[in-house]
Amino acid sequence: MYRRDFLKSVTAAWVAFGLPNPLGGAFATNRVIPLRRLGQSQRFDYEWLKERARALAATPYHSRKRVLPTPLERLSWDQYQSIRYRQDHALWADSDAHFQVKFFHLGLYFHSPVRMYEVVDGMAQELAYDPAAFDYGSSGLNGKGLPKDLGFAGFRLNTRKDIDRDFAAFLGASYFRAVGQEGQYGQSARGLAVNTGSSGPEEFPDFIAYYLEQPTADADTVVMYGLLDSPSIAGAYRFSITHADVLRMDIDSALYPRETIERLGIAPCTSMYQVGENDRRMGWDWRPEIHDTDGLFLWTGNGEWIWRPLCNPLHLRFNMFLDNNPRGFGLLQRDRDFDHYQDDGVFYEKRPCLWVEPKHGWGEGSVQLVEIPTFDETFDNIVAFWNPRNKPHPGQELLFGYRLYWGAFPPVSSSLAYCVATRTGLGGVVGQKRKYFSWRFAVDFVGGKLAALARVHDVSVEPVLHMTRGRPEIVSARPLHEIRGYRVMFDVVPLEDSAQQIDIRLYLRDTNGEPLTETWLYQWVPPILEERKY
């Protein structure tokens, strides 16, 4: 399936799920209606699920997408959004557990039923779909006439203390989201990415079953499992989700390829970047900036900290950052100033960062970044993931463990200064006639030792600047007292006959040659000769 066609449906459906449930309180009652179970309970643990995934990979793939009843197929987005799971049917609402589960209905874009199981004392039993568990709102449906075995589309988690607002949701293919202390959804994670950014169609694996382990009354963590399947690979996942200001997901995955996979994406992060300070190409909206995240943050295996601002390119852009045993990576929303977005409906300044922390050595490979052109803020056009160096082959077992952190800031930080803003525009000297085209970059760094250095006169802070082609001009690094940091400014003069991309690398160092800042990377594509205005 082609990514844009798929994401037109699934990512649009996520837009409103970060909002409180306006109907949730109306469903709250003291009476709890237990969910009906199907069949006999069976022994369950993660080893059993891994064997199930291994056996699945040894058989031909078959799609679980079903033809839905016409009324469900024809739902508008507003109609689908009005269908809500009833609080009196919530899983674990009749227990003392801190967590509860509510399910999503099939319909609109969601055609693949996901089987749901509850795990109690090591025994798993399937949960039955029940039309009476849903309030159909303004959808025009009342549940009558729907198949008894229709199934669920996904689920969301909330706490007993806040039944109207979920903190994590799993819906569509292998997508899931969570919130931190800001209580705002933003970017997504996925169980797996297959052939993202390649020349052919991308494959979107599905979680086909979830196993939800009933937590004890005093547990601050909920444990669940997912069975994943797709034409080229099957997998078993274990999630341990700790609800806190920075929400943590501890994930173990076991993957079993059916086919050789060209590009496997581990721990994929999916986000949106339409317009920002550094890239205003799509800036015709009245809002100054529109993005879920504004940069890729890397902590490499050799200890280097790297910041790569995101872009909304003219054409699909693919970058790989070679590494060995990475310490972490993620898509961050560093700009948290409401004035930079001016959107009091979706609150982009509150969107969570997502940080990936490998639990053990992942070996050689690369963090890969895919940036896709977009005209629409409901289309997720940014993907980052880990790609192992060796392509997976049938018969292998691939084990990856990692933690995901969702919150306003990543759980790790460097003692070095970091980039807080990247701005670009026409180069040259103000008041002087420009004789050729150049492009200006202004990069602001704060933190580390810079605040102290900015207060001292005659201190030498040197910018270290490299670029793959073209030449730099008017390079400077000076204190900027308004931010208690430094601003680096430079112009890039592209080759006259080339519109090839220019890779730029920058950091600040002191007189002893020691770095003062993280490494700032940028990829700039100059306009063709005929479009260079100066």
Curated annotation (Swiss-Prot):
Residues spanning the signal sequence: 1-28
Post-translational modification comment from the UniProt entry: Predicted to be exported by the Tat system. The position of the signal peptide cleavage has not been experimentally proven.
SUPFAM superfamilies: E set domains, Galactose mutarotase-like
Subcellular location: Periplasm
GO MF annotations in UniProt: carbohydrate binding; catalytic activity
Pathway(s) where this gene product acts: Glycan metabolism; osmoregulated periplasmic glucan (OPG) biosynthesis
Pfam families xref list: MdoG
Signal in keyword set: yes
Alphabetically ordered keywords of this record: Periplasm, Signal
Record has Signal as a keyword: yes
A single cellular component GO annotation: outer membrane-bounded periplasmic space
UniProt-listed PANTHER family: GLUCANS BIOSYNTHESIS PROTEIN, GLUCANS BIOSYNTHESIS PROTEIN D
Family matches, as HAMAP family: MdoD_OpgD
The family this protein is said to belong to: Belongs to the OpgD/OpgG family.
Protein name per the record: Glucans biosynthesis protein D
Organism: Xylella fastidiosa (strain M23)
Protein's gene: opgD
